[in-house]
A protein has these predicted regions:
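Gly/Ser/Thr-rich helix-start
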Residues: 36-37, 69-71, 108, 122, ...
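Structural signature of FAD isoalloxazine-binding scaffolds in flavoprotein oxidoreductases
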Residues: 35-36, 42-47, 74-92, 139-171, ...
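Conserved active-site and cofactor/substrate-binding residues in soluble primary-metabolism enzymes
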Residues: 2, 6, 27, 45-48, ...
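A generic local secondary-structure boundary/capping motif
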Residues: 72-73, 114-117, 125-129, 142-149, ...
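Short, basic and Ser/Thr-rich N-terminal targeting/leader segments
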Residues: 60, 67-69, 153, 224-225, ...
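Short acidic/polar capping segments at secondary-structure boundaries
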Residues: 101, 108-110, 130-132, 136, ...
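Anion-binding (especially nucleotide phosphate/pyrophosphate-binding) glycine-rich loop
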Residues: 2-135
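Phosphate/pyrophosphate- and phosphate-bearing ligand-binding catalytic cores of soluble enzymes
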Residues: 21-22, 73, 160-282, 286-305
């Protein structure tokens, strides 16, 4: 078993400018507001520092846990014996290399990136304005909403491969699918992406963003902690409709509840635990399988420790 104390000491010695938060409560870093203390959370400030951090952690016998805004995570509320590498504001720069492209770091929130596109008069990211995640996670899972997906705009992605070599993917190498990419469930670490967008009228772009934001506010439980859509969309249907048909709107386990506003969301009504959410998700999957014959697949990523 890896000695995380030794790894933290090595990080301090070999990466002197690295931001390191020891025994950091993960509930502060995920939108479910559930999560126990991680042995350490670190925030690298460059591709080189990210590679150095990951190499030190791996050389110490551990596997780094890479996160962004934590908007698609359910994390154990016990001690998390991991070194968490957060791609945050230190990796969130955005530039415009030419008239139709934006290049941004993996840590930039999608809302900020969409606003940057608006400011440059570029269309194509309106759908992403209300998605609470960051660019790295969004590209990795090909996040989408209201008819748009990240695959529609990603021209290239910069990443560290399994050997921590700096690489760049283009075109079909991204292997985008529904809530999937070539980076999903791999050891690759996304560093940033260049997006190919379309010139547009800023007034039209802003109007579209406002329309989608209003639709989200009216249909989704944005006033309660959640991880967004809890289950992936099954072939030929919608998870929310199947859950509603099973009579589970408002179904509660401890502090976790199937949202009364949108059955596709599991929300934290206050004091929900990791086990509350897991039990509720299991109950929902069992009920939907029984009533509809459909096996729902979690969209939220579960971190058990």
């Amino acid at each position: 078993m890896a000695n995380l104390d030794l790894i933290v000491r090595a990080l301090r010695a070999q990466c002197p400018g690295l931001e390191i938060l020891e025994h950091e409560p993960m509930r502060a870093h995920c939108s479910f507001r559930i999560g126990g203390p991680a042995r350490a959370l670190v925030r690298p400030a460059s591709a080189e520092e990210t590679a150095a951090v990951c190499r030190i952690v791996r050389d110490g016998g551990a596997q780094p846990l890479i996160i962004g805004n934590g908007t698609n995570l359910l994390i154990t509320d016990g001690a998390l014996e991991r070194i968490v590498v957060q791609m945050g504001d230190n990796m969130a720069a955005v530039t415009q290399p030419d008239a139709t492209h934006l290049s941004a770091g993996a840590g930039i929130p999608l809302a900020r990136l969409a606003q940057a596109a608006l400011g440059c008069g570029l269309a194509g990211l309106e759908f992403a304005h209300g998605i609470p995640g960051s660019l790295g996670g969004a590209v990795s899972m090909n996040a989408g909403a209201y008819g748009g997906e990240m695959k529609d705009g990603v021209g290239s992605a910069r990443y560290l491969d399994g050997e921590l070599r700096l690489c760049e993917a283009h075109g079909s190498a991204h292997d985008f699918g529904y809530r999937h990419s070539a980076f999903s469930d791999t050891d690759c670490v996304l560093l940033g992406s260049t997006l190919a967008l379309t010139p547009g009228d800023p007034a039209d772009i802003q109007a579209r963003m406002r329309d989608l934001s209003e639709r989200r506010r009216s249909r989704q439980p944005l006033d309660l902690p959640s991880a967004g859509s809890t289950f992936k969309r099954p072939v030929g249907g919608y998870a929310a409709a199947l859950i509603d048909q099973a009579g589970l709107k408002g179904y509660t386990v401890g502090g976790a509840q199937v949202s009364e506003k949108h059955a596709g969301f599991v929300v934290n009504r206050g004091g929900a635990t990791f086990d509350d959410v897991l039990r509720l998700m299991d109950d929902v999957r069992s009920a939907v399988l029984r009533t509809s014959g459909v096996e729902l697949e979690p969209e939220v990523k579960i971190i058990r420790g």
